[in-house]
C-alpha cells in the first residue's frame, strides 16, 4: 500500500486499516486522519507519536492499559488482537516452560501493581530469552522513567505495524 | 453494581466493564481508572466527560469517528458493538422503509462529507421518527457548533450506558 492510497482513504477505511497500530486504540488512528495528507511512513507515524505525547498523564497510562499482558492468563489467546497474537507467537513466549512461565507471570503481576499498567515490550525487536530479564530490570525503574520507557515500546510497536501495513522495511 | 465494587476493580476489569461507554474508545475508560476512587455515577461520568473535553480537536473528532453510522451500510450489523446494536434496535431504525432508509443513508453520507465524522445521536432519548428530521437539521449547522452538539450526544450515550451498568435510573 503506498501513501497515495493512504491519503485517499475516508475515515472509515483509515480506522479499519490503522485502528490497531496503537493496540486497541482506534481513537488515535481516527484522530490522526485529521492530519492527512501524509508525505510517507515517517510523517504518518509522527502524528501517531505526537498524539500520544500530547495526552495527559492519565491518557498515556490509558494507552498502556489497552495492551495485553505478555504471556498472561488474564487475556486468553483467543481475545488477543491479531497483531498481538502474531507478535507474541513470533517471540516464542508461548513456548516458555512451566517454571519460567510462572516466574514471568509473577513478575508481570508485580509490575502491574507497581506501575498501574501492564508490561509492554516490542517483542519483534527483542531476543525472546531477553524478555524476562528486561522485565526484571524495568520493574526496578522509577515510575516516571518507566512510563517513558513503556511509551517508547508502544511507539516501536506502532512503527513496526505501520511499516508492515505500508510494505516498507522497518 | 455499586460504586464500591467499581472502586475495587483493577484496570483490566474496569476496562472490560466500562471500555465501551464511549463507543470503541477503551483508551478513555483506561485513562479514567487513574482518577479512582469515584464517589458515584455523577463523579465517574464527570471524569469521562473531562477527558473528552481535554482532547485536542483531532481527538474529539476521533471519538466521533469511532461511532458507527446509524442504519448504515458501512458497518454491517454483525460488526456493531453490543451496546450500539441494542440501542439501534430499540430505536427501530432497522424498521425504516426502503425509501426512508435510502433518504436517511443519503443524508448521513452528506453529513459525513461535510463534517468528517458520522452522525451521532443518543437514540434512546429520541423519538425514532425524529432521527431523520434531526439529521436534516444538524446537517445545516456550522461545523464548530455541530462538533459540540455531536460530543453532547456522545456524553448522553455515555451517561445512559454508565447508568445501565450501575443499575441506576438515568
UniProtKB/Swiss-Prot annotation, chains A, B:
Keywords: Decarboxylase, Lyase, Peroxisome, Purine metabolism. Its main location: other. It is an enzyme of class 4 (lyase). The keyword Protein transport does not apply. GO terms for molecular function: 2-oxo-4-hydroxy-4-carboxy-5-ureidoimidazoline decarboxylase activity. It is found in: Peroxisome. Gene3D superfamilies: Oxo-4-hydroxy-4-carboxy-5-ureidoimidazoline decarboxylase. It catalyses: 5-hydroxy-2-oxo-4-ureido-2,5-dihydro-1H-imidazole-5-carboxylate + H(+) = (S)-allantoin + CO2. GO terms for cellular component: peroxisome. Pathway: Purine metabolism; urate degradation; (S)-allantoin from urate: step 3/3. GO terms for biological process: allantoin metabolic process; purine nucleobase metabolic process; urate catabolic process. Substrate binds at residues 68, 84-88, 119-123. InterPro entries: OHCU_decarboxylase (IPR018020), OHCU_decarboxylase-1 (IPR017580), OHCU_decarboxylase_sf (IPR036778). The active site is at 67 (proton donor). This is 2-oxo-4-hydroxy-4-carboxy-5-ureidoimidazoline decarboxylase. Catalyzes the stereoselective decarboxylation of 2-oxo-4-hydroxy-4-carboxy-5-ureidoimidazoline (OHCU) to (S)-allantoin.
Amino acid at each position: 500500500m503506498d501513501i497515495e492510497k493512504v491519503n485517499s482513504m475516508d475515515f472509515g477505511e483509515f480506522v479499519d486499516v490503522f485502528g490497531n497500530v496503537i493496540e486497541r486504540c482506534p481513537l488515535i488512528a481516527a484522530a490522526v486522519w485529521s492530519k492527512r495528507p501524509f508525505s510517507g511512513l515517517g510523517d504518518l507515524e509522527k502524528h501517531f507519536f505526537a498524539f500520544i505525547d500530547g495526552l495527559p498523564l492519565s491518557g498515556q497510562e490509558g494507552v498502556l492499559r489497552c495492551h495485553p499482558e505478555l504471556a498472561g492468563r488474564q487475556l486468553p489467546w483467543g481475545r488477543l488482537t491479531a497483531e498481538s497474537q502474531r507478535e507474541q507467537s513470533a517471540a516464542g513466549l508461548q513456548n516458555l516452560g512451566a517454571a519460567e512461565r510462572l516466574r514471568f507471570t509473577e513478575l508481570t503481576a508485580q509490575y502491574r501493581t507497581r506501575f498501574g499498567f501492564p508490561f509492554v515490550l516490542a517483542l519483534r525487536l527483542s531476543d525472546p530469552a531477553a524478555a524476562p530479564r528486561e522485565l526484571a530490570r524495568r520493574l526496578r525503574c522509577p515510575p516516571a522513567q518507566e512510563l517513558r520507557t513503556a511509551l517508547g515500546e508502544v511507539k516501536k510497536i506502532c512503527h513496526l505495524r505501520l511499516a508492515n501495513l505500508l510494505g516498507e522495511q522497518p
